[in-house]
C-alpha cells in the first residue's frame, strides 16, 4: 500500500494535483490518499471530501507522525517551500513539491542537500515537462539540432507584483526542450504602472550552452491566456499550442513542418483523450511517474538542482536585472 499525504490545499492543489491524485488512486488500487493538511481547517476538510483523502489536518508534523506516508506532496506558497521541504526530507519522507523549489540558489541547494543527506527522493513539479504535447515534441525532435526556440506565455489582467513564480514555467520548459542550460539572457521590462506597482511584461533573449538561440515573452498583461512554442531545427519547424486552463488553444496541438509539407499533426485530445486539464497540463504524469518510481524501488531521484538555473533567472526577473550570465 502506497500512502500519500498532501500539505497545502489551496487553488493549485484543487485545480491540478488533487484531481491527479484522485485519478491515480482510482487507477492504482494499492494506493491510499491518507491525509491532507492546511492551516485553514475548512480548506483541509473540503479537500479531503472532494478528493477522497482519509483524514484532514492543520499540523503537518502531526499528520506525518500519525500516518508515516510513503510520499508527500508539498503544495505551498514559494516563501515557505524551502523551509518546509527541508523539514519533511529530514524526517525521511520522499517528496514531490510544487514549483519553484525556492526563491534563490541557496534555498534550492538546501532542499537538494537535505534530500541527499536523508537518502530520499525529491522531485520538483515543473508540469510543462510532463505535458503530453511537450513530451511528443521532444520525441519528434529526437537528435535533430535545435537552432532556436520561441516561447510565448500570455495572460490577461494578471497584475501580479511578482510574475516570476509563473514565468519560471516557460524558463524551465525552454531549457528542458533545448536539453541544455542557458549561457546568457538579456532581460527587457515593459513597465506598466497604470496596471499596478511592479507590473510589467518581460522579454528574455539569449542563448543556451549548446548554441540554441531563445526568445521568451512573458506577458501577464496581454489580451488572452495561452502558451505557444516554436522550434526550428536543422531539419524541420515545430509549432506547439499548449492547452492550459481551457484556453483559446484547447485541446492544443503539435505540428511538424518541412518545407510546405506538414509531416506530423497531433491533436492534444489524441494524447489526453479524457479532456481533463490536469491530464493535458502534465499534473497527472508528474505525480504518477514519481509514485510509480517509488513503488518500484527505483534509484533515488534528486532533480532539484536541475531547476536551479530557472530559479536564478526568475530571481533576476524579481530583482529587475538586465542580464543573466551563467556561472
Identify the function of each model-found stretch:
Residues 1-51:
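N-terminal Rossmann-like dinucleotide-binding module
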Residues 40, 50-112:
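Beta-loop-alpha module in the N-terminal Rossmann-like domain of NAD(P)-dependent dehydrogenases
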Residues 101-160, 322:
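A contiguous active-site-proximal alpha/beta segment in oxidoreductase catalytic domains
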Residues 209-286:
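NAD(P)-dinucleotide binding in Rossmann-like oxidoreductases
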Amino acid at each position: 500500500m502506497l500512502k500519500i499525504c498532501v500539505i497545502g490545499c489551496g487553488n493549485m492543489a484543487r485545480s491540478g494535483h488533487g484531481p491527479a491524485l484522485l485519478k491515480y488512486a482510482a487507477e492504482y488500487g494499492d494506493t491510499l490518499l491518507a491525509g491532507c493538511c492546511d492551516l485553514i481547517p475548512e480548506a483541509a476538510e473540503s479537500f479531503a471530501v472532494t478528493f477522497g483523502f482519509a483524514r484532514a489536518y492543520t499540523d503537518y508534523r502531526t499528520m506525518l507522525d500519525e500516518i508515516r506516508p510513503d510520499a508527500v506532496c508539498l503544495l505551498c506558497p514559494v516563501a515557505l517551500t524551502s523551509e518546509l521541504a527541508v523539514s519533511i526530507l529530514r524526517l525521511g519522507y520522499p517528496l514531490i513539491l510544487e514549483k519553484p523549489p525556492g526563491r534563490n540558489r541557496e534555498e534550492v541547494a538546501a532542499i537538494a542537500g537535505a534530500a541527499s543527506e536523508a537518502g530520499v527522493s525529491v522531485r520538483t513539479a515543473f508540469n510543462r515537462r510532463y505535458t503530453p504535447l511537450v513530451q511528443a515534441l521532444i520525441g519528434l525532435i529526437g537528435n535533430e539540432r535545435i537552432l532556436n526556440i520561441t516561447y510565448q506565455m500570455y495572460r490577461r489582467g494578471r497584475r501580479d507584483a511578482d510574475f516570476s513564480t509563473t514565468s519560471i514555467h516557460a524558463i524551465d520548459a525552454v531549457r528542458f526542450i533545448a536539453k541544455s542550460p542557458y549561457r546568457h539572457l538579456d532581460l527587457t521590462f515593459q513597465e506598466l504602472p497604470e496596471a499596478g506597482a511592479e507590473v510589467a511584461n518581460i522579454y528574455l533573449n539569449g542563448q543556451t550552452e549548446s548554441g540554441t538561440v531563445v526568445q521568451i515573452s512573458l506577458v501577464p498583461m496581454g489580451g488572452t491566456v495561452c502558451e505557444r512554442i516554436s522550434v526550428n531545427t536543422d531539419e524541420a519547424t515545430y509549432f506547439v499550442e499548449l492547452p492550459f486552463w481551457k484556453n483559446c488553444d484547447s485541446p492544443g496541438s503539435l505540428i511538424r513542418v518541412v518545407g510546405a509539407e506538414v509531416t506530423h499533426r497531433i491533436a492534444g485530445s489524441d494524447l489526453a483523450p479524457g479532456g481533463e486539464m490536469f491530464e493535458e497540463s502534465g499534473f497527472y504524469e508528474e505525480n504518477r511517474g514519481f509514485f510509480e518510481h517509488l513503488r518500484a524501488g527505483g534509484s533515488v531521484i534528486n532533480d532539484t538542482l536541475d531547476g536551479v538555473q530557472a530559479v536564478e533567472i526568475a530571481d533576476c526577473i524579481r530583482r529587475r536585472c538586465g542580464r543573466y550570465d551563467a556561472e
